Amino acid sequence: MDPRSEVMLRQAELFQGPLLIAGAPADGLLGQLPKAHGWTWHAGDQALLESRFGNRCHHGVGVPEVAFDAAILFLPKSRELAAYLLNALAARLAGRELYLVGEKRGGIEGAAKQLQAFGKPRKLDSARHCQLWQVTVDHAPEAKPLESLAERFELPLEDGPLQVVSLPGVFSHGRLDKGTALLLEHLDGLPSGHVLDFGCGAGVLGATIKRRYPQSQVTLLDVDAFAVAASRLTLAANGLEGQVISGDGIDAAPGELDLILSNPPFHTGVHTDYQASENLLKKSGEHLRKGGEIRLVANSFLRYQPLIEGALGNCEIRAEAQGFRIYRATRG
C-alpha cells in the first residue's frame, strides 16, 4: 500500500463519512473506506481503481459531482497543481475539513502552508516519511476556473508562431523544454499519414505537425488528464483539429500508425519511472505500419538505442546536443 495511504489509515476514524480522495493512489485504500470516492487524473490509476471499486472512482480535471463532507488531497509533484486542487476542494467545503497528505521529499511541509489561506492548519501525524495535515475551512474561496491558471506562450517556428497553452501539472509548464526544442529542429523527412504524439503534454509536437502537414491525421495521447486538456486548448488556440485521448501508455494508442513522435516521460510524481517509455520502445512495432517510423528525443544517459534496435532491428542517432539525443527507427 502507498505509504501516504498507510499514514492516512492511522487516523482512520476521521475518514468514515462521505469523503473525496483527490489524487487517489491505485491501492486498496478505497476498500478500507466504504463511504469514500476516489478522484484521479491519471488514466492508468483510474483503470485500476475502476476495476476494483467501480463507480466510486472518477477521472478528470474538475472536482467530481458527488456528495462529500470532507476531502483529502494526496500531494502532487507540481506546486501550481496543488494550489489549484486545494482551492477547488476548499470551495466545496465551507466549515468542513480539508486534509493534505504527502511525502516529506515531495515537499509536504512547504505545501501545508497553502492551507493557511483557508484556516489554521495543524499536523495530525508524521510516519513513513510522510505527513498528514488538516484544516477546517473557515475561509472558503471561490473556485477558480482551470483555464484562468493556464500559461500561454508563443513558439517562434519557421512556418510562423505557434500558440501553446499549458496547465498546472503538465510537463514543462509554461515553457518549452530543451528536449522538445531539439526535436522540433529535426522534423525533416517525416512520413505522411497517421501521426501519434505520445506523451503529448501541452501538445506542442502534435500541433506543430498538424499545422505543417494539414492532411495528416494527428492523435495526441497522454496519461494525464491535465495534459489532455492542455493539448486540446493548444490545438484550439491555433485553429487546428486533432484527436486527443487519455490513456496509459502505448497500449492505449491506435494501430496502423505511420509515425510516432515523442519526448517520452520518465517520472511519475517525485519518483523515476521508465516503464511507459520502455514499453513504447518495445511495442512501437505493434502500432506502426510497415515502413512506419518512430522519432523521439531522450536524455543522452538513457540507454534507449538497444531497446529500439531490439524492437525494430534498426536505430540511428540523428542528432545530439545539450545532453539529448534524437533517435530514429523504421519498421521493416
UniProtKB/Swiss-Prot annotation:
Q: What is its EC number?
A: 2.1.1.172
Q: Where in the cell is it found?
A: Cytoplasm
Q: What UniProt keywords apply to this chain's record, in alphabetical order?
A: Cytoplasm, Methyltransferase, rRNA processing, S-adenosyl-L-methionine, Transferase
Q: Which domain of life is it from?
A: Bacteria
**What is known about what this protein does?**
Specifically methylates the guanine in position 1207 of 16S rRNA in the 30S particle.
Family listed: Belongs to the methyltransferase superfamily. RsmC family.
Protein name, UniProt field = Ribosomal RNA small subunit methyltransferase C
